[in-house]
Amino acid sequence: MTHEIRAIFDRIAPVYDQLNDWLSLGQHRIWKEMAIKWSNPQPGETFLDLCCGSGDITLGLARRVGATGHVYGVDFSANLLAMAQERSQRKYPYQSTITWVEADVLDLPFDSNQFAGATMGYGLRNVKDIPHSLQELYRVLKPNAKAAILDFHRPENAQLRSFQQWYLDNVVVPIATQLGVKEEYAYISPSLDRFPMGKEQVELAYEVGFASATHYPIANGMMGVLVVSK
């Protein structure tokens, strides 16, 4: 399954940002900013951005930790990491403060208690073992560190859930089809059906040891941010 998902993200890399704009009605950058804010980066700190994709959140974190801090952007798609690196060279002057790492979030190549905070944008839904992924995140965070995990969410409201499904079927998949990546985006709906709801995410976070966990529904419950503290 991991190899299949890695292959999907390698294939969609060229149209990833364009599709994210359509997927989110142009709002994903606002939601990513919310996740950054909740993770509370401070100047000089070392931060981690998991499933960094094309680097939006990584760059946002880098701007906040500044020239004296450091951010590690981690993804298992080599194509997306190459895109992220290219974008960062155009948009961010302090290249030495960002390290791009090709790695699996289920087996992070970092020491325990290494990071002052972390983010994950649209990644938790795609890992094959969510509790283990949260355990790895817990391991690499310093005591009292915060992390914010942004992802799609099935709304509890039946009408909003119907709208979300209609939008995925009638807007997202046709656009993906036009861009030649229909199969790659058709998986979003089944992945959402498997994904734990907000309160279940909170329970999983407590089970792996986090001291506090809160799930914030955003975009009428069609997105959510899980905020945890070690």
Label the predicted regions.
Residues 1-17, 167-168:
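N-terminal, positively charged/glycine-rich alpha-helical extensions of SAM-dependent methyltransferases
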Residues 45, 106-118:
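A short acidic, Gly/Pro-enriched loop at the edge of an enzyme's catalytic core
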Residues 46-107:
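Class I SAM-dependent methyltransferase SAM/SAH-binding core
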Residues 116-130:
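A short SAM/SAH-binding and catalytic strip from SAM-dependent methyltransferases
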Residues 202, 209-230:
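Core SAM-dependent methyltransferase catalytic element
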Residues 25-45, 60:
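Conserved alpha-helix/loop element of class I SAM-dependent methyltransferases that forms part
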Residues 131-146:
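A short glycine-rich, Lys/Arg-flanked "PGG" loop and its adjoining helix->strand segment in the class I
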Residues 3-4, 150-206, 214:
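C-terminal alpha-helical "lid/dimerization" subdomain adjacent to the S-adenosyl-L-methionine
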